[in-house]
Amino acid sequence: MELYERIIPKTSSTSYISGWEALNIPDENRNTADWHPRTYLFSYDKDKAINLYNTTNVLGNSGIKKRTIDYPSKREVYIANFPRAIADLVLTMKDYQLPSLHNCCSDFLNEDETEQLYQYLRSIKDNPRVDEFLKYEFTVRYFNDKKL
């Protein structure tokens, strides 16, 4: 079977590449956070498109930027940075999928990006999934912040 590059639909600041797809596209420094581009950027279905995200109602436009990507092919798109991509996953994935993000900070992010992710998610109130993620991924900080 032939493998095809997934179609990248028209993006905007409110409909952008994020999640696993963004984690597999190199950032401005040519780094990738994840290492499964074939899974998320290619398909045996020649008409399959990349999923676009929109959580701007919760997180605004922080971490979303218009830039040129070189992979899977060169084009200008709106794309989330790695911390925002993980925050979008936490907000949009099904509860049973959340464990796939366990240890994502040490697996995917540097120290500054880890702090960005924490700040994104800490700003979200009354969301049990976000609380559960913060409890697991940022245990000490989560409980220290609860004391304040």
Description of each model-found segment:
Residues M1-K66:
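Short gly/ser-rich loop at a beta-strand->alpha-helix junction or flexible surface loop bordering the NTP-binding
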Residues I64-L148:
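Hydrophobic alpha-helical interaction segments
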